[in-house]
Amino acid sequence: MTTYNWIVIGAGITGACLAYELSQQGLNVLLIEKDKTPNNATVYSYGGLAYWSGTDKLTRTLGGEGIELHRNLSQELDADTEFRDLDLVLTIDRQDDPEVILQNYARFAITPELLSVNDACILEPLLNPNAISGALKLPHGHIHTQKTTEAYLQAFERNNGVIIYDRVIDLLHQGDSVVGVQTENDTYQADNTVVCAGGLSRSLLQQANIEVENYYTHAQLILTPPVDFELGTVVMPAVQQRFILEAKARELTTEDWDPPYDLAPKAILDPGAVQFLDGRICMGQISALAPNPQAKLNPFKAEAEIRERVSNVLPLLEDIPGTCHSCLVAFNNKAIALIGNLADIKGIYIFSGFTSTLVFAPVLAKRFARWVLGKEDKIIEELQLVISATQPHQN
């Protein structure tokens, strides 16, 4: 049986970029993904690159590295990620004071430009002028997240990386070390295993009696077929409820996140939309805090709510065909990401729970791959310290 240097669990954008970067270091890597046809946060991503949103030295450094990486990624991977610079329009509700909202953005690396209603509608003609009191304009990047992930996977395979489609059901232990994984169909051995399973990372690790403070919301959004009109910007609300919802997760106990999942779901809606280069539109999104990762949310109710709220800002989108989808979106309340060795167990790592996933994950994957081979990296070491300080010992 082959013993790999690394097993990476999960082939969304985080697992794909990490597997690629590990293989770039000459390591023998196995990537295991449960779904041959992906159905995850990568597939349903807006694709936005909020490199402007750094608030301290760490996030500003990574924001700069992240946008620079994406500008050159198509060339590096020899495949089109559909990267482009695209203005972000943050709409301000009619009842809100634009100057007050602007002040809320003063802490970011790039200060937004405050637009009048008229100027906002000139920049994005599809906006409803009667629904807003103004807007904030920011430079933003955009990619096709699934095509970017596929580009990473193809480059990974060119580096002799191996991809297997199977479901990981347990970790293989030998003494105080993890030495591989058990899937539904086989076992695989490795010196190191890293979990990049997004919102499912927590439940996967729980099966191995490892507690991790990696949480998730259930996102619901609408994807449309290509349309014959153009949305020229990324449109999102200036006051986003999702971050408030994630902050409320701090009030939950560990028991709330464990079966039998008695906590009633709490949901918010941030109305926004983006159009891809092929003409498809993604609009949403509802975020629901429901500890059961298999929770069943009503797609018909969600679609009606999304259409009502989005059409208030972008009336032309109200009746266009589209299908409501859902996925888990991972987050944590400790750091910009959960990266590093888990508990007191050798050979098991996590790479999940990102803020600004598309900006931070690719550059942190590059840093992590070099760090595990002995290159000093203060950012990865800082993130490891966060995990070490909060991680309970193995049950």
Question: Can you name each region flagged by the protein language model?
Answer:
Residues Q24-V43:
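Glycine-rich FAD pyrophosphate-binding loop
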Residues L136-E184, Y188:
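Helical element adjacent to the flavin cofactor pocket in flavoenzyme catalytic cores
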Residues Y20-E21, L49, T81-F83, G199-C324, ...:
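Active-site substrate-recognition segment that forms the wall
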Residues Y46-L123, I268-P271:
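Dinucleotide-binding Rossmann-like beta1-alpha1 core, especially the glycine-rich loop
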Residues M1-G12:
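Beta1/beta-strand and adjacent pyrophosphate-binding region of the FAD-binding site
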Residues T61, L90-P98, A135-Q154, K296-A302, ...:
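Short beta-strand to alpha-helix junction loop
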Residues I7-I9, Y188-L200, A365:
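Short hydrophobic core segments
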